[in-house]
Amino acid sequence: MSPQTETKASVGFKAGVKDYKLTYYTPDYQTKDTDILAAFRVTPQPGVPPEEAGAAVAAESSTGTWTTVWTDGLTSLDRYKGRCYGIEPVPGEESQFIAYVAYPLDLFEEGSVTNMFTSIVGNVFGFKALRALRLEDLRIPPAYIKTFQGPPHGIQVERDKLNKYGRPLLGCTIKPKLGLSAKNYGRAVYECLRGGLDFTKDDENVNSQPFMRWRDRFLFCAEAIYKAQAETGEIKGHYLNATAGTCEEMIKRAVFARELGAPIIMHDYLTGGFTANTSLAHYCRDNGLLLHIHRAMHAVIDRQKNHGMHFRVLAKALRLSGGDHIHAGTVVGKLEGERDITLGFVDLLRDEFVEKDRSRGIFFTQDWVSLPGVLPVASGGIHVWHMPALTEIFGDDSVLQFGGGTLGHPWGNAPGAVANRVALEACVQARNEGRDLAREGNEIIREASKWSPELAAACEVWKEIKFEFPAVDTI
Protein backbone atom coordinates (compact mmCIF):
# COMPACT_ATOMS: atom_id res chain seq x y z
CA MET A 1 0.00 0.00 0.00
CA SER A 2 1.46 3.38 -0.94
CA PRO A 3 2.24 5.91 1.82
CA GLN A 4 -0.26 8.28 0.25
CA THR A 5 -3.20 5.93 0.68
CA GLU A 6 -2.23 4.39 4.02
CA THR A 7 -3.99 5.70 7.12
CA LYS A 8 -2.04 5.39 10.38
CA ALA A 9 -5.13 5.34 12.56
CA SER A 10 -3.57 3.05 15.11
CA VAL A 11 -0.55 5.26 15.94
CA GLY A 12 -2.06 7.12 18.87
CA PHE A 13 -5.29 9.12 18.93
CA LYS A 14 -5.20 12.84 18.28
CA ALA A 15 -8.53 14.60 18.71
CA GLY A 16 -9.57 17.37 16.36
CA VAL A 17 -10.71 18.11 12.83
CA LYS A 18 -8.62 17.59 9.70
CA ASP A 19 -9.23 18.06 6.00
CA TYR A 20 -11.02 15.16 4.32
CA LYS A 21 -8.51 15.20 1.49
CA LEU A 22 -5.69 14.13 3.81
CA THR A 23 -7.36 10.74 4.22
CA TYR A 24 -9.90 10.27 1.42
CA TYR A 25 -8.33 11.91 -1.67
CA THR A 26 -6.01 9.27 -3.16
CA PRO A 27 -5.23 10.03 -6.82
CA ASP A 28 -2.66 7.21 -7.00
CA TYR A 29 -5.18 4.54 -6.03
CA GLN A 30 -5.56 1.69 -8.51
CA THR A 31 -9.18 0.55 -8.56
CA LYS A 32 -9.94 -3.12 -7.97
CA ASP A 33 -12.23 -5.38 -9.97
CA THR A 34 -14.32 -5.81 -6.82
CA ASP A 35 -14.76 -2.08 -6.08
CA ILE A 36 -18.07 -0.33 -6.63
CA LEU A 37 -17.17 2.79 -8.62
CA ALA A 38 -19.23 5.98 -8.60
CA ALA A 39 -19.14 9.11 -10.73
CA PHE A 40 -20.53 12.17 -8.91
CA ARG A 41 -21.22 15.57 -10.44
CA VAL A 42 -20.10 17.87 -7.60
CA THR A 43 -20.86 21.57 -7.17
CA PRO A 44 -18.89 22.73 -4.11
CA GLN A 45 -19.61 25.82 -2.07
CA PRO A 46 -17.45 28.85 -2.98
CA GLY A 47 -13.98 28.48 -1.49
CA VAL A 48 -14.11 24.67 -1.16
CA PRO A 49 -11.35 23.10 -3.32
CA PRO A 50 -12.44 20.32 -5.69
CA GLU A 51 -10.16 17.78 -4.00
CA GLU A 52 -11.64 18.55 -0.58
CA ALA A 53 -15.22 18.34 -1.89
CA GLY A 54 -14.55 15.04 -3.67
CA ALA A 55 -12.85 13.62 -0.59
CA ALA A 56 -15.79 14.77 1.55
CA VAL A 57 -18.17 12.82 -0.70
CA ALA A 58 -16.00 9.70 -0.38
CA ALA A 59 -15.75 10.10 3.39
CA GLU A 60 -19.37 10.88 4.19
CA SER A 61 -20.64 8.04 1.98
CA SER A 62 -18.32 5.48 3.57
CA THR A 63 -16.40 5.55 6.88
CA GLY A 64 -15.86 9.24 7.60
CA THR A 65 -17.46 11.79 9.86
CA TRP A 66 -16.79 15.46 10.59
CA THR A 67 -14.12 14.92 13.26
CA THR A 68 -11.46 12.41 14.22
CA VAL A 69 -12.81 9.64 16.46
CA TRP A 70 -10.80 7.31 18.68
CA THR A 71 -12.64 4.22 17.41
CA ASP A 72 -10.85 4.65 14.06
CA GLY A 73 -8.03 2.82 15.81
CA LEU A 74 -10.18 -0.25 16.36
CA THR A 75 -10.50 -1.11 12.67
CA SER A 76 -8.55 -0.96 9.42
CA LEU A 77 -9.61 2.30 7.84
CA ASP A 78 -7.66 1.49 4.69
CA ARG A 79 -9.72 -1.63 4.14
CA TYR A 80 -13.11 0.05 4.47
CA LYS A 81 -12.85 3.71 3.46
CA GLY A 82 -14.14 5.11 0.19
CA ARG A 83 -11.52 6.85 -1.92
CA CYS A 84 -11.84 9.79 -4.29
CA TYR A 85 -9.37 8.64 -6.91
CA GLY A 86 -10.06 11.13 -9.70
CA ILE A 87 -11.29 14.65 -10.40
CA GLU A 88 -12.16 16.06 -13.80
CA PRO A 89 -13.87 19.31 -14.85
CA VAL A 90 -17.32 19.35 -16.42
CA PRO A 91 -17.02 20.99 -19.88
CA GLY A 92 -18.80 24.34 -19.98
CA GLU A 93 -19.34 24.47 -16.21
CA GLU A 94 -16.82 26.49 -14.20
CA SER A 95 -18.05 25.46 -10.77
CA GLN A 96 -18.71 21.75 -11.39
CA PHE A 97 -16.56 18.68 -11.73
CA ILE A 98 -16.84 14.90 -11.79
CA ALA A 99 -15.48 13.13 -8.72
CA TYR A 100 -14.73 9.42 -9.08
CA VAL A 101 -15.08 7.42 -5.88
CA ALA A 102 -14.18 3.76 -5.23
CA TYR A 103 -15.92 1.79 -2.48
CA PRO A 104 -14.61 -1.53 -1.11
CA LEU A 105 -17.10 -4.34 -1.58
CA ASP A 106 -17.11 -5.20 2.12
CA LEU A 107 -19.05 -1.99 2.83
CA PHE A 108 -22.22 -3.48 1.33
CA GLU A 109 -24.68 -6.19 2.31
CA GLU A 110 -25.02 -8.90 -0.30
CA GLY A 111 -28.14 -8.75 -2.47
CA SER A 112 -29.40 -5.46 -1.02
CA VAL A 113 -30.01 -2.44 -3.26
CA THR A 114 -31.43 -0.78 -0.16
CA ASN A 115 -28.12 -1.02 1.68
CA MET A 116 -26.10 0.01 -1.39
CA PHE A 117 -28.07 3.23 -1.80
CA THR A 118 -28.21 3.93 1.93
CA SER A 119 -24.41 3.95 1.92
CA ILE A 120 -23.66 5.75 -1.34
CA VAL A 121 -26.44 8.37 -1.46
CA GLY A 122 -28.13 8.09 1.91
CA ASN A 123 -26.57 11.02 3.80
CA VAL A 124 -24.00 12.87 1.75
CA PHE A 125 -26.51 14.77 -0.40
CA GLY A 126 -27.34 17.07 2.51
CA PHE A 127 -23.71 17.98 3.14
CA LYS A 128 -23.30 21.75 3.66
CA ALA A 129 -19.93 21.97 1.91
CA LEU A 130 -21.69 21.08 -1.36
CA ARG A 131 -24.11 23.34 -3.20
CA ALA A 132 -25.33 20.39 -5.27
CA LEU A 133 -24.47 16.75 -5.87
CA ARG A 134 -25.59 14.26 -8.49
CA LEU A 135 -24.76 10.58 -8.85
CA GLU A 136 -24.21 10.17 -12.60
CA ASP A 137 -23.26 6.49 -12.81
CA LEU A 138 -22.21 3.39 -10.87
CA ARG A 139 -20.00 0.47 -11.87
CA ILE A 140 -21.40 -2.63 -10.17
CA PRO A 141 -18.69 -5.31 -10.01
CA PRO A 142 -19.51 -8.89 -11.07
CA ALA A 143 -18.71 -10.12 -7.55
CA TYR A 144 -21.58 -8.01 -6.20
CA ILE A 145 -23.96 -8.67 -9.10
CA LYS A 146 -23.71 -12.40 -8.40
CA THR A 147 -25.36 -11.83 -5.00
CA PHE A 148 -28.60 -10.68 -6.71
CA GLN A 149 -31.35 -12.68 -8.40
CA GLY A 150 -32.15 -9.80 -10.74
CA PRO A 151 -35.20 -9.86 -13.06
CA PRO A 152 -37.67 -12.66 -12.32
CA HIS A 153 -37.43 -14.06 -15.86
CA GLY A 154 -35.78 -11.80 -18.43
CA ILE A 155 -36.36 -11.04 -22.09
CA GLN A 156 -35.99 -14.47 -23.70
CA VAL A 157 -38.07 -16.29 -21.09
CA GLU A 158 -40.83 -13.69 -21.49
CA ARG A 159 -40.90 -14.16 -25.27
CA ASP A 160 -41.09 -17.91 -24.80
CA LYS A 161 -43.95 -17.55 -22.31
CA LEU A 162 -45.87 -15.28 -24.70
CA ASN A 163 -44.81 -17.08 -27.90
CA LYS A 164 -44.14 -13.71 -29.56
CA TYR A 165 -40.96 -13.02 -31.50
CA GLY A 166 -39.48 -10.65 -34.05
CA ARG A 167 -41.25 -7.44 -33.06
CA PRO A 168 -41.77 -5.06 -30.14
CA LEU A 169 -44.65 -5.88 -27.82
CA LEU A 170 -47.67 -3.56 -27.77
CA GLY A 171 -49.36 -2.21 -24.68
CA CYS A 172 -51.88 0.35 -23.47
CA THR A 173 -52.50 2.11 -20.17
CA ILE A 174 -56.21 2.19 -19.36
CA LYS A 175 -57.60 5.73 -19.11
CA PRO A 176 -59.02 7.57 -17.32
CA LYS A 177 -56.50 6.30 -14.83
CA LEU A 178 -58.85 6.91 -11.89
CA GLY A 179 -62.62 6.80 -11.51
CA LEU A 180 -63.75 3.80 -13.58
CA SER A 181 -65.69 0.99 -11.94
CA ALA A 182 -64.08 -2.44 -12.03
CA LYS A 183 -66.55 -3.74 -14.62
CA ASN A 184 -66.08 -0.81 -17.00
CA TYR A 185 -62.34 -1.06 -16.47
CA GLY A 186 -62.41 -4.73 -17.45
CA ARG A 187 -64.47 -3.88 -20.52
CA ALA A 188 -61.82 -1.38 -21.66
CA VAL A 189 -59.12 -4.03 -21.14
CA TYR A 190 -61.03 -6.57 -23.22
CA GLU A 191 -61.60 -4.18 -26.13
CA CYS A 192 -57.92 -3.24 -26.30
CA LEU A 193 -56.70 -6.82 -26.14
CA ARG A 194 -59.12 -8.17 -28.74
CA GLY A 195 -58.09 -5.32 -31.05
CA GLY A 196 -54.53 -6.61 -31.22
CA LEU A 197 -52.55 -5.39 -28.21
CA ASP A 198 -50.39 -7.80 -26.23
CA PHE A 199 -50.85 -6.07 -22.89
CA THR A 200 -52.97 -3.54 -21.09
CA LYS A 201 -51.88 -1.82 -17.91
CA ASP A 202 -52.99 -0.37 -14.61
CA ASP A 203 -51.69 3.16 -14.22
CA GLU A 204 -49.19 3.76 -11.46
CA ASN A 205 -51.69 5.18 -8.96
CA VAL A 206 -54.36 2.51 -9.49
CA ASN A 207 -54.12 0.50 -6.27
CA SER A 208 -57.30 -0.14 -4.25
CA GLN A 209 -59.48 2.96 -4.04
CA PRO A 210 -63.16 3.32 -3.07
CA PHE A 211 -64.33 3.46 -6.69
CA MET A 212 -62.49 0.23 -7.62
CA ARG A 213 -61.12 -2.21 -5.07
CA TRP A 214 -58.16 -4.28 -6.17
CA ARG A 215 -59.85 -7.68 -5.95
CA ASP A 216 -62.76 -6.59 -8.17
CA ARG A 217 -60.35 -5.14 -10.72
CA PHE A 218 -58.26 -8.31 -10.79
CA LEU A 219 -61.35 -10.46 -11.39
CA PHE A 220 -62.77 -8.38 -14.24
CA CYS A 221 -59.35 -8.02 -15.88
CA ALA A 222 -58.78 -11.78 -15.72
CA GLU A 223 -62.15 -12.32 -17.40
CA ALA A 224 -61.15 -9.83 -20.12
CA ILE A 225 -57.82 -11.59 -20.69
CA TYR A 226 -59.37 -15.03 -21.09
CA LYS A 227 -62.11 -13.77 -23.39
CA ALA A 228 -59.64 -11.89 -25.62
CA GLN A 229 -57.31 -14.90 -25.76
CA ALA A 230 -60.18 -17.15 -26.84
CA GLU A 231 -61.14 -14.75 -29.64
CA THR A 232 -57.67 -13.96 -30.98
CA GLY A 233 -55.68 -17.13 -30.33
CA GLU A 234 -52.88 -14.99 -28.86
CA ILE A 235 -51.55 -14.91 -25.30
CA LYS A 236 -52.63 -11.69 -23.59
CA GLY A 237 -51.86 -9.99 -20.30
CA HIS A 238 -52.78 -7.07 -18.07
CA TYR A 239 -50.31 -5.48 -15.65
CA LEU A 240 -52.17 -5.93 -12.38
CA ASN A 241 -50.70 -3.35 -10.00
CA ALA A 242 -49.87 -5.13 -6.75
CA THR A 243 -48.36 -2.03 -5.11
CA ALA A 244 -49.80 -1.62 -1.62
CA GLY A 245 -49.27 0.07 1.71
CA THR A 246 -47.51 -2.94 3.24
CA CYS A 247 -45.35 -5.74 1.87
CA GLU A 248 -47.79 -8.28 3.27
CA GLU A 249 -50.70 -6.74 1.36
CA MET A 250 -48.59 -6.54 -1.80
CA ILE A 251 -47.76 -10.24 -1.66
CA LYS A 252 -51.43 -11.07 -0.96
CA ARG A 253 -52.39 -9.32 -4.20
CA ALA A 254 -49.64 -11.12 -6.10
CA VAL A 255 -50.87 -14.46 -4.76
CA PHE A 256 -54.41 -13.71 -5.92
CA ALA A 257 -53.15 -12.73 -9.39
CA ARG A 258 -51.32 -16.05 -9.62
CA GLU A 259 -54.44 -17.93 -8.55
CA LEU A 260 -56.38 -16.22 -11.35
CA GLY A 261 -53.77 -17.40 -13.87
CA ALA A 262 -52.59 -13.87 -14.69
CA PRO A 263 -49.26 -13.88 -16.57
CA ILE A 264 -47.94 -10.56 -15.27
CA ILE A 265 -48.23 -8.16 -12.33
CA MET A 266 -46.90 -4.68 -11.70
CA HIS A 267 -45.08 -2.68 -9.02
CA ASP A 268 -44.19 1.00 -8.50
CA TYR A 269 -40.60 0.33 -7.45
CA LEU A 270 -39.55 3.76 -6.22
CA THR A 271 -42.64 4.65 -4.21
CA GLY A 272 -42.92 1.03 -3.05
CA GLY A 273 -39.24 0.82 -2.15
CA PHE A 274 -36.39 -1.48 -3.11
CA THR A 275 -36.94 -3.93 -0.26
CA ALA A 276 -40.55 -4.46 -1.31
CA ASN A 277 -39.57 -4.67 -4.97
CA THR A 278 -36.90 -7.29 -4.41
CA SER A 279 -39.30 -9.35 -2.30
CA LEU A 280 -41.91 -9.20 -5.06
CA ALA A 281 -39.35 -10.11 -7.74
CA HIS A 282 -38.38 -13.22 -5.78
CA TYR A 283 -42.05 -14.20 -5.46
CA CYS A 284 -42.56 -13.70 -9.21
CA ARG A 285 -39.67 -15.96 -10.16
CA ASP A 286 -40.79 -18.66 -7.75
CA ASN A 287 -44.36 -18.55 -9.09
CA GLY A 288 -43.94 -17.94 -12.83
CA LEU A 289 -45.23 -14.35 -12.90
CA LEU A 290 -43.71 -11.64 -15.08
CA LEU A 291 -43.09 -8.33 -13.30
CA HIS A 292 -43.74 -4.95 -14.91
CA ILE A 293 -42.09 -1.98 -13.18
CA HIS A 294 -43.35 1.59 -13.19
CA ARG A 295 -40.87 4.33 -12.29
CA ALA A 296 -43.37 6.71 -10.63
CA MET A 297 -41.48 9.43 -8.71
CA HIS A 298 -38.27 9.03 -10.75
CA ALA A 299 -38.25 12.61 -12.04
CA VAL A 300 -38.19 13.91 -8.46
CA ILE A 301 -34.82 12.17 -8.20
CA ASP A 302 -33.33 12.30 -11.69
CA ARG A 303 -34.60 15.24 -13.73
CA GLN A 304 -32.42 18.07 -12.41
CA LYS A 305 -29.03 18.10 -14.07
CA ASN A 306 -27.03 19.26 -11.05
CA HIS A 307 -28.58 17.42 -8.12
CA GLY A 308 -30.04 13.99 -7.46
CA MET A 309 -29.35 10.75 -9.27
CA HIS A 310 -29.37 9.98 -12.99
CA PHE A 311 -31.95 7.49 -14.22
CA ARG A 312 -29.19 5.22 -15.54
CA VAL A 313 -28.32 4.55 -11.89
CA LEU A 314 -31.97 3.86 -11.03
CA ALA A 315 -32.14 1.56 -14.08
CA LYS A 316 -29.10 -0.42 -12.94
CA ALA A 317 -30.58 -0.66 -9.45
CA LEU A 318 -33.85 -2.00 -10.87
CA ARG A 319 -32.02 -4.67 -12.87
CA LEU A 320 -30.37 -5.79 -9.63
CA SER A 321 -33.56 -5.58 -7.55
CA GLY A 322 -35.70 -7.29 -10.19
CA GLY A 323 -38.19 -6.45 -12.91
CA ASP A 324 -38.96 -7.76 -16.40
CA HIS A 325 -40.14 -4.40 -17.82
CA ILE A 326 -39.41 -0.81 -16.81
CA HIS A 327 -40.59 2.50 -18.22
CA ALA A 328 -37.68 4.22 -19.94
CA GLY A 329 -39.06 7.29 -21.74
CA THR A 330 -39.86 7.57 -25.43
CA VAL A 331 -37.46 10.16 -26.93
CA VAL A 332 -40.35 11.25 -29.20
CA GLY A 333 -43.29 11.50 -26.77
CA LYS A 334 -44.38 13.86 -24.01
CA LEU A 335 -41.82 12.83 -21.37
CA GLU A 336 -38.24 13.96 -20.81
CA GLY A 337 -35.53 11.94 -22.56
CA GLU A 338 -32.67 12.90 -24.90
CA ARG A 339 -31.97 10.21 -27.51
CA ASP A 340 -28.34 9.28 -26.85
CA ILE A 341 -28.79 9.30 -23.07
CA THR A 342 -31.97 7.22 -23.33
CA LEU A 343 -30.33 4.63 -25.58
CA GLY A 344 -27.43 4.47 -23.15
CA PHE A 345 -29.54 3.30 -20.25
CA VAL A 346 -31.73 1.17 -22.54
CA ASP A 347 -28.58 -0.80 -23.39
CA LEU A 348 -27.71 -1.00 -19.69
CA LEU A 349 -31.13 -2.56 -19.11
CA ARG A 350 -31.01 -5.10 -21.95
CA ASP A 351 -27.44 -6.02 -22.80
CA GLU A 352 -25.07 -8.39 -21.04
CA PHE A 353 -21.98 -6.18 -21.53
CA VAL A 354 -21.91 -2.41 -22.13
CA GLU A 355 -18.73 -0.49 -22.92
CA LYS A 356 -17.92 2.90 -21.42
CA ASP A 357 -19.25 5.60 -23.76
CA ARG A 358 -19.26 9.16 -22.46
CA SER A 359 -21.14 10.37 -25.55
CA ARG A 360 -24.14 8.44 -24.18
CA GLY A 361 -23.48 9.28 -20.54
CA ILE A 362 -22.00 5.87 -19.69
CA PHE A 363 -19.05 6.51 -17.36
CA PHE A 364 -18.02 2.90 -16.73
CA THR A 365 -17.88 -0.39 -18.61
CA GLN A 366 -20.56 -2.64 -17.11
CA ASP A 367 -20.45 -6.44 -17.19
CA TRP A 368 -23.77 -7.98 -16.07
CA VAL A 369 -22.35 -11.55 -16.00
CA SER A 370 -25.48 -13.25 -17.36
CA LEU A 371 -27.99 -11.38 -15.17
CA PRO A 372 -31.25 -11.44 -17.19
CA GLY A 373 -32.14 -8.32 -19.16
CA VAL A 374 -35.08 -5.95 -18.72
CA LEU A 375 -37.44 -4.84 -21.52
CA PRO A 376 -37.57 -1.03 -21.79
CA VAL A 377 -41.10 0.36 -22.03
CA ALA A 378 -41.71 3.42 -24.22
CA SER A 379 -44.80 5.16 -22.90
CA GLY A 380 -46.12 8.69 -22.68
CA GLY A 381 -47.71 10.85 -25.38
CA ILE A 382 -47.10 8.50 -28.32
CA HIS A 383 -49.39 7.65 -31.24
CA VAL A 384 -49.34 5.92 -34.63
CA TRP A 385 -47.20 8.58 -36.34
CA HIS A 386 -44.47 7.81 -33.79
CA MET A 387 -44.43 4.09 -34.61
CA PRO A 388 -41.60 4.17 -37.20
CA ALA A 389 -39.33 6.20 -34.91
CA LEU A 390 -40.11 4.02 -31.89
CA THR A 391 -39.46 0.82 -33.84
CA GLU A 392 -36.17 2.22 -35.13
CA ILE A 393 -35.02 3.64 -31.77
CA PHE A 394 -35.95 0.79 -29.43
CA GLY A 395 -35.79 -2.25 -31.71
CA ASP A 396 -37.61 -5.54 -31.14
CA ASP A 397 -36.78 -6.03 -27.47
CA SER A 398 -39.09 -3.35 -26.11
CA VAL A 399 -42.69 -2.64 -25.17
CA LEU A 400 -44.42 0.24 -26.99
CA GLN A 401 -47.27 1.45 -24.84
CA PHE A 402 -50.03 3.69 -26.18
CA GLY A 403 -52.58 4.94 -23.64
CA GLY A 404 -54.28 7.96 -25.13
CA GLY A 405 -52.87 6.78 -28.47
CA THR A 406 -55.23 3.78 -28.24
CA LEU A 407 -58.18 4.93 -26.16
CA GLY A 408 -58.38 8.30 -27.91
CA HIS A 409 -59.23 6.74 -31.28
CA PRO A 410 -62.44 8.31 -32.63
CA TRP A 411 -64.06 4.89 -33.13
CA GLY A 412 -63.23 3.43 -29.73
CA ASN A 413 -60.73 1.23 -27.94
CA ALA A 414 -60.69 -1.83 -30.20
CA PRO A 415 -60.20 0.22 -33.42
CA GLY A 416 -57.47 2.15 -31.60
CA ALA A 417 -55.72 -1.11 -30.82
CA VAL A 418 -56.15 -2.26 -34.43
CA ALA A 419 -54.57 0.97 -35.68
CA ASN A 420 -51.52 0.51 -33.47
CA ARG A 421 -51.09 -3.16 -34.37
CA VAL A 422 -51.36 -2.43 -38.10
CA ALA A 423 -48.87 0.44 -37.80
CA LEU A 424 -46.42 -1.77 -35.91
CA GLU A 425 -46.72 -4.70 -38.33
CA ALA A 426 -46.22 -2.32 -41.27
CA CYS A 427 -43.08 -0.84 -39.71
CA VAL A 428 -41.60 -4.24 -38.86
CA GLN A 429 -42.29 -5.53 -42.38
CA ALA A 430 -40.78 -2.41 -43.95
CA ARG A 431 -37.68 -2.68 -41.76
CA ASN A 432 -37.28 -6.36 -42.62
CA GLU A 433 -37.49 -5.44 -46.30
CA GLY A 434 -34.57 -3.03 -45.83
CA ARG A 435 -36.46 0.25 -45.81
CA ASP A 436 -35.20 3.17 -43.72
CA LEU A 437 -37.74 3.80 -40.96
CA ALA A 438 -36.18 7.10 -39.93
CA ARG A 439 -36.38 8.53 -43.45
CA GLU A 440 -39.45 6.76 -44.87
CA GLY A 441 -41.54 6.39 -41.71
CA ASN A 442 -44.39 8.72 -42.63
CA GLU A 443 -44.70 7.18 -46.07
CA ILE A 444 -44.81 3.67 -44.57
CA ILE A 445 -47.68 4.70 -42.28
CA ARG A 446 -49.57 6.38 -45.14
CA GLU A 447 -49.26 3.27 -47.29
CA ALA A 448 -50.57 1.05 -44.50
CA SER A 449 -53.49 3.39 -43.80
CA LYS A 450 -54.79 2.83 -47.35
CA TRP A 451 -55.90 -0.69 -46.42
CA SER A 452 -56.70 -0.06 -42.75
CA PRO A 453 -59.53 2.40 -42.10
CA GLU A 454 -58.77 2.23 -38.36
CA LEU A 455 -55.21 3.41 -38.98
CA ALA A 456 -56.38 6.07 -41.42
CA ALA A 457 -58.73 7.51 -38.78
CA ALA A 458 -55.94 7.53 -36.17
CA CYS A 459 -53.57 9.25 -38.58
CA GLU A 460 -56.10 12.00 -39.18
CA VAL A 461 -56.74 12.63 -35.47
CA TRP A 462 -53.09 12.89 -34.43
CA LYS A 463 -51.46 14.33 -37.53
CA GLU A 464 -50.67 17.67 -35.83
CA ILE A 465 -49.71 16.40 -32.36
CA LYS A 466 -46.07 16.97 -31.40
CA PHE A 467 -44.15 17.39 -28.14
CA GLU A 468 -41.10 19.37 -29.19
CA PHE A 469 -39.37 20.78 -26.11
CA PRO A 470 -35.62 20.75 -25.44
CA ALA A 471 -34.46 18.10 -22.97
CA VAL A 472 -33.46 19.35 -19.53
CA ASP A 473 -30.98 16.52 -18.92
CA THR A 474 -28.28 16.50 -21.61
CA ILE A 475 -24.71 15.23 -21.82
Curated annotation (Swiss-Prot):
Decide whether keyword Disulfide bond is in the record: yes
Q: Which GO terms describe its biological process?
A: photorespiration; reductive pentose-phosphate cycle
Places the protein is found = Plastid, Chloroplast
Q: Which GO terms describe its molecular function?
A: magnesium ion binding; monooxygenase activity; ribulose-bisphosphate carboxylase activity
Record field: catalytic activity:
2 (2R)-3-phosphoglycerate + 2 H(+) = D-ribulose 1,5-bisphosphate + CO2 + H2O; D-ribulose 1,5-bisphosphate + O2 = 2-phosphoglycolate + (2R)-3-phosphoglycerate + 2 H(+)
EC number(s) reported in the record: 4.1.1.39
Q: Which UniProt keywords apply?
A: Acetylation, Calvin cycle, Carbon dioxide fixation, Chloroplast, Disulfide bond, Lyase, Magnesium, Metal-binding, Methylation, Monooxygenase, Oxidoreductase, Photorespiration, Photosynthesis, Plastid
| PTM characteristics | The disulfide bond which can form in the large chain dimeric partners within the hexadecamer appears to be associated with oxidative stress and protein turnover.
Q: Which GO terms describe its cellular component?
A: chloroplast
- InterPro entries named in the record: RuBisCO, RuBisCo_large_chain_AS, RuBisCO_lsu_C, RuBisCO_lsu_C_sf, RuBisCO_lsu_fd_N, RuBisCO_lsu_N_sf, RuBisCO_lsuI
- Give the similarity note: Belongs to the RuBisCO large chain family. Type I subfamily.
Misc. comment: The basic functional RuBisCO is composed of a large chain homodimer in a 'head-to-tail' conformation. In form I RuBisCO this homodimer is arranged in a barrel-like tetramer with the small subunits forming a tetrameric 'cap' on each end of the 'barrel'.
Q: What does the UniProt record say this protein does?
A: RuBisCO catalyzes two reactions: the carboxylation of D-ribulose 1,5-bisphosphate, the primary event in carbon dioxide fixation, as well as the oxidative fragmentation of the pentose substrate in the photorespiration process. Both reactions occur simultaneously and in competition at the same active site.
Any idea what this protein is called?
Ribulose bisphosphate carboxylase large chain
**To which species is this protein native?**
Carica papaya (Papaya)
Gene expressing this chain: rbcL
